[in-house]
Curated annotation (Swiss-Prot):
Entry's Gene Ontology BP terms: cell division; regulation of division septum assembly
Family to which the UniProt record says this protein belongs: Belongs to the MinE family.
InterPro entries given in the database record: MinE (IPR005527), MinE_sf (IPR036707)
Name used for this protein in its record: Cell division topological specificity factor
The keyword Cell division appears for this protein: yes
Gene name linked to the record: minE
Pfam families, per database record: MinE
C-alpha cells in the first residue's frame, strides 16, 4: 500500500507549506509568551534576599516556571552556594 500511496499522493502547494511553517512559528511564540511578566522582578527580589545572608554571584541563581497541566505551575529555584562561607557586606 505504501507504493500506491506514493503514486497517489498530492504534492504540497507552497500555500500549504507556508501555512504549516506559520503554525509552527505561532506555536513556538505562544510557548515563549507563557512566561509571566513578573518573573524577572521575582528573580531580582529573590536574589536580593539571598544576598542578605550569603554572598553569591547573580549568575549562580536560576529561576524557571514550568506549566504542569492547565492549572498547575511549578516555580523552580536553583542556587549554587559558594563552598567557603563569607559574610555579606
Amino acid at each position: 500500500m505504501a507504493l500506491l500511496d506514493f503514486f497517489l499522493s498530492r504534492k504540497k502547494t507552497t500555500a500549504n507549506i507556508a501555512k504549516e511553517r506559520l503554525q509552527i512559528i505561532v506555536a513556538e511564540r505562544r510557548r515563549g509568551d507563557s512566561e509571566p511578566h513578573y518573573l524577572p522582578q521575582l528573580k531580582r527580589d529573590l536574589l536580593a534576599v539571598i544576598c542578605k545572608y550569603v554572598q553569591i554571584d547573580p549568575e549562580m541563581v536560576s529561576v524557571q516556571l514550568e506549566q504542569k497541566g492547565d492549572d498547575i505551575s511549578v516555580l523552580e529555584l536553583n542556587v549554587t552556594l559558594p563552598e567557603n562561607e563569607e559574610a555579606p557586606k
